[in-house]
């Protein structure tokens, strides 16, 4: 279900998950997508533009619910993020940290089934998807740290240059008198 979960009460959401588990074939998949409140713009602003949203639904809560209610495994995926930000060394501005986290997330939950059918989905469950706040904040910090290292290096070089020029300052003072 795409953008359904955040419109339901917790009781109705649990009923939906239980019914999905009951009706799915063995090793079947339930996919629930919702706004990602880890994205600060979504969590503090755009989520509330839809008055039918019940409450923000953290991905960790939805992932917990599907496991607690009987699904064999689940995976949280970040979705709908900016393509340039997906690149490992994409833009790392402060605004990217605040707004670039995947604006939506999906929880894929798999019902228990025979081992071979379950194994055919292992690749999907092993891969990482989307952009998290931690990932973007770390990218930003790495960029900041690199700039700081370059600044320190330039300051050290400048100090050496000033020391090399010290005798010339003395000579210059002789001619100014």
Regions picked out by a protein language model, each given a short descriptive name:
Residues 101-107:
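Short hydrophobic/aromatic beta-strand or adjacent loop that forms the aromatic wall/cage
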Residues 37-39, 79-83, 112-115:
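Short, solvent-exposed loop/turn segments at secondary-structure junctions
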Residues 108, 112-177:
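Boundary detector for helix-to-coil junctions that initiate low-complexity/charged tails
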Residues 62, 91-98:
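Short, P/G- and charge-enriched loop/turn segments at secondary-structure junctions
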Residues 70-83, 94-95:
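Conserved S-adenosyl-L-methionine
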Residues 52-54:
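Donor nucleotide-sugar recognition loop
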Residues 1-43, 56-68, 109:
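Conserved SAM-binding loop
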Residues 43-50, 89-91:
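Short glycine/proline- and charge-enriched loop/turn segments
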């Amino acid at each position: 279900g795409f953008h359904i979960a955040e419109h339901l009460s917790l009781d109705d959401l649990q009923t939906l998950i239980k019914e999905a588990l009951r009706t799915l074939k063995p090793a079947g998949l339930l996919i629930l997508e919702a706004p990602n409140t880890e994205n600060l713009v979504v969590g503090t602003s755009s989520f509330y533009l839809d008055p039918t949203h019940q409450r923000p639904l953290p991905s960790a809560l939805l992932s917990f619910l599907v496991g607690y209610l009987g699904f064999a495994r689940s995976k949280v995926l970040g979705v709908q993020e900016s393509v340039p930000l997906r690149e490992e060394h994409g833009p790392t501005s402060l605004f990217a940290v605040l707004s670039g986290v995947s604006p939506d997330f999906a929880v894929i939950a798999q019902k228990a089934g025979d081992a071979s059918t379950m194994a055919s989905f292992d690749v999907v469950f092993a891969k990482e998807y989307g952009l998290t706040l931690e990932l973007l904040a770390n990218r930003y910090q790495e960029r900041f740290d690199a700039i700081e290292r370059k600044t320190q290096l330039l300051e050290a070089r400048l100090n050496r240059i000033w020391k090399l020029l010290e005798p010339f300052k003395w000579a210059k003072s002789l001619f100014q008198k």
